[in-house]
Amino acid sequence: MGSSSSYRTGAVLVIIACVFFALNGIVAKIAIDGGLSPISVAAVRTVGSALCLLPFVVLVWRRFTRAMLPPMIAYAAIGIFASQALYFQTLSYLDVALALVLVYIAPLPIAIYQHVRRGERLPRYAYVVMVVAIGGVTLSVLGGGGGVGAVSIIGVCFGLATMITFAAMVILSARQPAQLGSMGRAGAPMIVAAVLYLFVVPPWAFPYDKLDDVVMLAGRFPLEVPLWTTLVWIVVLGSVVPFSLVLAGNARVGSGAASMLGMTEPVVGSIAAWVILGQLLTLVQIVGILITVVAVAIVEHARTRFIHEVELPGMLPPLADGNPR
């Protein structure tokens, strides 16, 4: 009875985290549309998260060795710095739902990598379902009513690039030092990524004058808020809180189940983008997103069932250490 209750609690925690992560993309979209550059939003999220995680890194500082640096730097540069920058850049060109569905096909290249590089095979049906997932993505991207001309090709390219960096993040996460613990594994590369962002967006170059500007939600509930509040959300409710929920949820349900539950994020993000931003999808796009989510969930279920070395995090954008998202 206790075990069942613990599992339900963990599932609820992971789903709540998915809701926060989905809303984070929407809030980031508002900040970008409000005048901040995508790279500035990414920098705020990373630096803010790094500051929140810094105390946990200090606690395990003595466990660090020089051998940990190469995989940690690679993870920070590709899995955090590049993926965050590319994801927010994607949001500047595409609707939130399309950005999420592009990123969430990451299990496909991960499975292919494990097949080609490690010889780890999935059941045949999983490879068939991969093709179905690609078809679903095609419907969601091109089904907006205007065909290819109605969607930003640049945005799609950024989305696919984000997906590749996310897949790389998952693969690299398996090489992060376990002796640092979950918070240490998440915090150390986050700090490295934050340092990289400080070179790209130095504090003196940040557009502080825009922070008091007012931005408006354009959905069913029009609301004006100061721009700075979106950044507070992105760091606290879009990063630190959901990440903590993921850690607590993973401990109860396991990373495999958390990964499956994480597939609710594109669906939640699509609905929330409609309500909050007024971003409408066509019936074809809705069908495409649902096909993609179900297909990727099937592939991920097969992957976590037959292959255990690399576990896909349950939500995006990446904050956690491969367990995440």
Residue ranges and their predicted role:
Residues 40-51, 87-130, 162, 255-274:
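Specific alpha-helical transmembrane segments that line the substrate/conduction pathway
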Residues 53, 122-144, 284-303:
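Hydrophobic transmembrane alpha-helices of multi-pass small-molecule transport proteins
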Residues 8-12, 39-55, 74, 126-135, ...:
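Hydrophobic alpha-helical transmembrane segments of multi-pass integral membrane proteins
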Residues 22-23, 47-51, 108, 134, ...:
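Small-residue-rich packing faces within the transmembrane alpha-helices of Major Facilitator Superfamily
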Residues 1-44, 148-175, 183, 199, ...:
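Glycine-/small-residue-enriched transmembrane alpha-helix faces in small-molecule transporters
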Residues 1-3, 12, 46, 227-229, ...:
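C-terminal-most transmembrane helix of multi-pass membrane proteins
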Residues 44, 84, 99-105, 172-195, ...:
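Helix-helix packing/entry segments at the starts of transmembrane helices
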Residues 20-25, 54-103, 139, 235-253:
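Specific transmembrane alpha-helical segments of multi-pass solute transporters/efflux pumps
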